[in-house]
Amino acid sequence: MLGKILKKEDCAACRFCCSFRRTSLWETPIFTKENIEAIKTNPSLDETVLNVIEKDGYCFAKYDLSGQYKTDDADEEVPCPYLGENGCILSDDEKPWDCKIWPLRVMNKDGEIVVALTPTCPSINRLEFAYVKDFVSVNLKKDITEYAAAHPFLIKEYRSDFPII
């Protein structure tokens, strides 16, 4: 979604968004029912890494990386199970919405849906916040908030270090 302001090569070389420390497990992506079905039809993908959840009439999935850590080091990172040597191996239909909108996050702040910016993305942090905010506000915010309202299980709780767009 941010392909007009972020270079694909920079993101592919970085991979920061595709690995998780224990403190960032809350950010592992959520897969919609449609993502799950698309993954199931692709024989080259392992669907067993997904924990399917049915809650409040919605079906979605997350993967659990907690057992993948090899040390007690808080800074140890574990990659997404769908991260290949050349980047993400998921097609657009298989890729979770969280990944599609990274480094943006849709969050619940005091009952209001807000679009926020992940403060740790090296690529987006090279850009002026005002520029990113204007781009997102004009081009993406409406679609993102509408999608989130229709898929409330994708909304994460607000964190104060995430600047609101």
Model-predicted regions and their roles:
Residues M1-I165:
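Short loop/turn segments that flank or connect secondary-structure elements
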